[in-house]
């Protein structure tokens, strides 16, 4: 079995300029994902998909490969991760590089470690599912969520759960925005990941942080320090 890790990292991040290579406790943010992928020992190649020369240079420094430059039409705010992964698989196939399994690992997942990737891969192989992705439990019961209408009035999505006890409600999970294992065939079929043909690797909340704002970035640094307390 040949395994490929693809790390998408475009250069045009808006809310945090140069997010993928911004300093994160002394190293570029993307370096954590590259090193974890390499040190996990499960990938034959760790490949960057980027349109940005500086990001490519940083990724090469930390051991990733960059055999192509991503097209600009796959580098805007509307390009999906699935399309980026498909593009990478197809380019590598045209270079006679064929892989059985492909992992999309986000550049913004510094809270992971190599052992998590190894355990997730083992579960993916054991389950024989099309996909396996990182998920985490919602902190609050989603059944008791509400919304505000145009007049800022409160409406529950489902009033029957107003008096329900939290422990009586079904647990709900969300995508952790960290990694996605899949067979090459499944990726190229462009099948929807959030279906019964997928399985999940549940992460504790202290390993999950969606880095979209400067506040998110600073919170991720705090989590990293807490998780690696002995190193600081």
Swiss-Prot record:
This is Pseudaminic acid cytidylyltransferase. The keyword Repeat does not apply. SUPFAM superfamilies: Nucleotide-diphospho-sugar transferases. Its EC number is 2.7.7.81. Catalyzes the final step in the biosynthesis of pseudaminic acid, a sialic-acid-like sugar that is used to modify flagellin. Mediates the activation of pseudaminic acid with CMP by forming CMP-pseudaminic acid. GO terms for molecular function: metal ion binding; N-acylneuraminate cytidylyltransferase activity. It catalyses: pseudaminate + CTP = CMP-pseudaminate + diphosphate. Belongs to the CMP-NeuNAc synthase family. Keywords: Magnesium, Metal-binding, Nucleotidyltransferase, Transferase. InterPro entries: CMP-NeuNAc_synthase, Cytidylyl_trans, Nucleotide-diphossugar_trans, PseF. Its cofactor is Mg(2+). It is an enzyme of class 2 (transferase). It comes from the Bacteria.
